[in-house]
Structure formats: structure tokens, C-alpha cells
Amino acid sequence: MTTSYVAVDLETTGIGTKREKITEIGMVKVVDGTVVDTYHTLVNPYREIPERVVELTGITDEMVKDAPGIEELLPSVVAFCDGFPLLGHQVIFDFGFLTQATVNAKMKFEKDGIDTLKLCRYLMPGPEKKNLGAACAYFGITPDTAHRALSDAMSAHLLYQKLMEQFGEARSELFEAKKLVFKAKKERPATKRQKEHLQDLLKYHRIESAVHIDKLSGNEISRMIDHIIFTYGRVPESAGGRKGKTAAGQSAVPRLFPESR
């Protein structure tokens, strides 16, 4: 059975790894069942955090405005996890975001992992809810703060220990870390022309934006441009418009920018 691991939990602006960003990282390093170290940091997503996410996590724009970006934190995150499998409740979610970030930074992040959600689905009674909060309540675990990264990482660790105590001897094969697989492509960097086009649109339509343009990928800027053109219209050529093209150089496709944005 796997008894040494790093329990991990991330808070993010949403679900998709290509469109959403990390806002908080919590990790708990465990050696032979004993907690030996923890890691916690807020992360600046360089964009506005959606209100529904603020309500869920309590993490606000004000809290992250002076926090480092994920690119600054990756070396310490990767080093903290080095030599250990990951453990988490739906661990592929956390692994996916970290993988996308490391791919963008041209770093490697290959890991084995243990998913406490899958263990709960195998081992808990069918009618019982299997989300982290419900599973912890079922096993008598009281988390410090729900939907905060370090607290949830600790809860996943304690849940795993309870599951091992009750089922490890009879179902030891379920408690072995397995290779985590998540395919991620490096995001295309934004061009100077894209950034200028977006800035022109924001200025002309007097749109206030909390997004840091220099931190956006090319695809993200293209989606923003398409959304602004669809909603507000183009910048007229007489006002310095860029001949009715999107930043990628193609005719704008009328489509709404994703709500999670």
C-alpha cells in the first residue's frame, strides 16, 4: 500500500485547464502515514475571480492581487512534490491544472497518483454522497475550512488514512498509486498585434477589465476579441480600427465569450 505521498488541492477560477487559472495551492507531505511538511500559497490568476467562485471559496481579487503568479511558484511546487505520488479527491483535476502550467513553462511533471474519490466510490455504501465534505462527515472527519486548498488537502489525507484503516488489509490493491495521465498542449503566446487589437477595443468601447493582457495566451485574447466585437461592435477604421479582423488575422466569428470568464 502507498503510505507516503503529497496530498494536493487547488482552488481555481473554474473547471477548464485552458481557460481557467489557479488561485490557491495547498499540499501536505506525508511519509509513512505521518505529516512531515505542508505547502500553501495564494496564486494571482491575473484576472477577475467569478463571483460564484468567490462565494464558494472565499478567495477574492483583493486577496490574490499581490500574490505571485503560477509561473513564479512552479519550481517550488515541483520540488515539494519531487519523489512522491500525488493524492487528492478527484486528483486528476489538480494534476491537470499543474500539468498545463508546467507544459506552458516547458517543465516536466510526471506523477503517479491516488484518487480518494475513486476509493470512496469503491468502498462506501452506494446511497452515500462521495464528495469530499460528505465523505469526511461519513468517516467522522471535521475539516478546518471547506473549499480552501490546504484544509481540503489535509482532509483528503485524513480520509485516505481512514479508508486504509478500514479497507486496506482486505483491498490492498486499491491503495497503490497509479500513473496519472493528462494530455496538455502548450498555450500559444499572444502576439503584439493581438495585444494592441484588444487594447484598442477596450479603449474605444470604454470597457473596464481586471485582466492582465500581458498574461493572456493568444487563444484567450482571440476569445476576448470575438466576444467584444460580437457584443459591442468593431472599432471603426476612422477611429483607428484594424480593418475588421480578429487579432489572429481572421474574420471575427460571432460567439459569446465563456461565462466562466
Question: What residues fall within each predicted segment?
Answer:
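Conserved non-catalytic scaffold segment of RNase H-like nuclease domains
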Residues: M1-K111, P125-H147
